Amino acid sequence: MTFFTDMFIIVRMKNKRTGAEDRMNQNEKKEMKIRIAKEEDAEALLAIYAPYIEHTVITYEYDVPTVEEFRGRIRHVLERYPYLVAELNGEICGYAYASAFHDRPAGGWNVETSIYVEQNKKGMGIGTALYDKLEKILKRQNILNMNACIACTEIEDEYLTNASIRYHEHLGYRMVGWFTNCGYKFHRWYNLAWMEKEIGEHVADQPPVIAFPEIVRDISLQNGELRL
């Protein structure tokens, strides 16, 4: 899958400044690059993910995986689904990917989406840009439903707020499931929500899902940009 390496898109930051953008360094380019992840990104992506494991309930994982294990996760996702990385000034600042929602054939038109942004760069539009490109690629694959599994709580605390639920609602997701006291971390119990966004038409003669490697060349341009 070496042909994934140099494919990217450029996202222009909006001229209208937000509070988060004001926190950006004055010399930082107002340009975001989103590209397909490489296995070599594992260490940088893990550096973003690890604090979510160690200090939040956003992920139910307890132990930080090794770089080699994380590299394997990237490789596994790219065998069938998109795994995207966001960069600011050449530095990775976030990532998003899709994975199988159900391992039975009838559920193949559904995916589970995941997104993580460097914690000191939230509010800059990174997550929205990643999700936007992810959704467009999934549509090309004939995926119909994007599902997000979100840790949530009745009482917000230092480990978890319900900001992710509000964010996904803003992106067009709707609540479809709620599980009570099903996650135990930091000696506390937390809930779990499933949110869904339909991105395609459900028909009787449904076109098959196309694996991500099969569409990569179709969405690329001469300079390696993704045509989305």
PLM features per residue range, with description:
Residues 123-139, 162-166:
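Conserved acetyl-CoA-binding loop-helix of GNAT-fold acetyltransferases
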Residues 149-151, 165, 169-188, 200-201, ...:
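Conserved catalytic-core motifs of GNAT/GCN5-like acyltransferases
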